[in-house]
């Protein structure tokens, strides 16, 4: 049996990709934090004055296609471009999209800017993730820890962006109109988001050759015939032998099995931006002394927990106990923890019910219920998302690595649709019932995934 030599620490290329992704996520989440406000605010208030229903529909299509285009960008990178060039094209295109939103400040500029962001994300997103996986040999247990570190970069950008962009739009560049209304500096928020993307690209292009070597410089479709047999074959890390086509197909089938479970996880998790956010706005006591915390600020709680907890998870996955946990078990536990998180929201509903009329917006539940929900959801996320990214790079044949990474990211697209339907039942069923059903369903899914552990491992052919 071939044993993969384990090394301590991580290659410096990981930290280059960490900062590149951090600035890209800063750019994206900074723009996303103000997009719906920019669409719906009146022109005199710094917005475009769109109808709210149309704006929500446009927002949904935008975020949906952001998760769809990586399928195309991943295929182009694998077949023609190479991952490094695809990341550069994607980054520059997204930067131009942000600058278009800033420069034109019109409906035409909006559509052009959003289109550039959608296209750019398609090139960037799947390929930078597969570059992380390419830093490690098959069977290297550091890979899960590496994706946890990488995931911390994603959330560091996501945490900082709404705070920085909020100051830019609401304070630094906000002005008062003659009628006393405020004109927000949303276009300057897009400018700062574009500058963030520019910083990420400068770092990536200046240091890429030094810290990544020739990783991702060639598309699989461009390698020589002699190299094709080496590049396109997957290896069983337990035996050191090449996998045949049947075994590779079984590995790919595992990606789709885990994707189904991931859809249900994210459908529950994404309630943070819909049903949980609305419940927080109406029924959670957000006051600390005389200060009331803006509802939007709670979108930074999850990234804050990610940045805080990710180093601990990195150490845990690298520990003897962590190395023994298989991917299905990790992800199953993550789903169960998500379900437990919703129990705290059920507790918030119960507190309000005990205090009086549940429809009275003055009847508030304690803030701690919400914080505990976000904490447990974050722990569940750390068991699902970086582990999922890692296992896709392990299971994918090299010739399909970026495409299958893009397929994995489609789980978020489907989850947002499912999550929207779930959230729509809050008005008729009540928040408590919806939270109860989510908690029960995702927990059952988690238990089922753990029970399927042995079956799935057989299909993974040496990957754990």
PLM regions with names:
Residues 1-16, 137-141, 166-290, 313-323, ...:
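Intracellular loop-helix junctions on the cytosolic face of multi-pass helical membrane proteins
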Residues 33-56, 274-296:
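Short amphipathic helix-loop junctions that connect adjacent transmembrane helices
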Residues 89-110, 336-359:
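C-terminal ends and interior cores of transmembrane alpha-helices
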Residues 22, 97, 108-124, 354-383:
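Hydrophobic core of transmembrane alpha-helices in multi-pass small-molecule transporters
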Residues 69-102:
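Conserved MFS/SLC helix-loop-helix module at the cytosolic interface between two early adjacent transmembrane helices
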Residues 66, 144-173, 189-200, 299-306, ...:
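Glycine-rich segments within core transmembrane alpha-helices of 12-TM secondary carriers
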Residues 68, 206, 291-323, 334-342:
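Transmembrane alpha-helices of Major Facilitator/SLC transporters
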Residues 56-77, 159-161, 300-313:
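Central cavity-lining transmembrane alpha-helices of secondary-active solute carriers
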């Amino acid at each position: 049996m071939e044993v993969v030599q384990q090394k301590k620490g991580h290659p410096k290329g990981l930290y280059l990709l960490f900062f590149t992704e951090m600035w890209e996520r800063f750019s994206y989440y900074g723009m996303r934090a103000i997009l719906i406000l920019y669409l719906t605010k009146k022109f005199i208030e710094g917005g475009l004055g769109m109808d709210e229903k149309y704006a929500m529909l446009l927002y949904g299509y935008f975020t949906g296609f952001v998760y769809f285009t990586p399928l195309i960008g991943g295929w182009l990178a694998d077949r023609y471009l190479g991952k490094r060039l695809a990341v550069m094209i994607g980054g520059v295109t997204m930067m131009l999209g942000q600058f278009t939103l800033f420069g034109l400040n019109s409906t035409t500029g909006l559509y052009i800017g959003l289109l550039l962001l959608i296209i750019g994300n398609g090139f960037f997103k799947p390929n930078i993730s597969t570059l992380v996986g390419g830093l490690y040999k098959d069977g290297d247990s550091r890979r899960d820890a590496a994706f946890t570190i990488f995931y911390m970069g994603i959330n560091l950008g996501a945490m900082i962006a709404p705070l920085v962009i909020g100051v830019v739009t609401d304070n630094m560049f906000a002005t008062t109109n003659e009628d006393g209304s405020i004109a927000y500096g949303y276009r300057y928020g897009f400018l700062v988001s574009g500058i963030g993307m520019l910083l990420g690209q400068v770092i990536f292009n200046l240091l890429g050759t030094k810290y990544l070597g020739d990783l991702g410089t060639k598309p699989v479709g461009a390698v020589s015939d002699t190299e094709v047999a080496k590049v396109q074959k997957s290896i069983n890390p337990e035996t050191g032998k090449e996998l045949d086509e049947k075994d590779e197909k079984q590995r790919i089938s595992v990606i789709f099995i885990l994707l189904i479970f991931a859809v249900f996880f994210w459908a529950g998790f994404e309630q943070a931006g819909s049903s949980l956010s609305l419940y927080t706005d109406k029924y959670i006591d957000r006051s600390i002394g005389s200060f009331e915390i803006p509802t939007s600020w709670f979108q930074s709680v999850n990234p804050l927990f990610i940045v805080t907890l990710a180093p601990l998870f990195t150490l845990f996955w690298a520990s003897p106990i962590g190395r023994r946990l298989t991917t299905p078990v990790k992800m199953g536990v993550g789903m169960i923890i998500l379900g437990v998180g919703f129990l705290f929201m059920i507790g918030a509903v119960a507190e309000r019910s005990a205090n009086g009329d549940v429809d009275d917006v003055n009847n508030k539940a304690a803030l701690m219920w919400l914080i505990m929900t976000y904490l447990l959801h974050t722990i569940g996320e750390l068991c699902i998302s970086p582990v999922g990214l890692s296992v896709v790079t392990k299971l994918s044949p090299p010739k399909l690595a970026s495409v299958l990474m893009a397929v994995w990211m489609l789980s978020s697209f489907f989850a947002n649709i499912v999550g929207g339907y779930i959230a729509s039942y809050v008005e008729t069923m009540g928040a408590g019932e919806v939270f109860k059903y989510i908690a029960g369903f995702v927990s059952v899914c988690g238990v089922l995934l753990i029970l399927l552990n042995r079956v799935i491992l057989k299909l993974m052919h040496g990957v754990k």
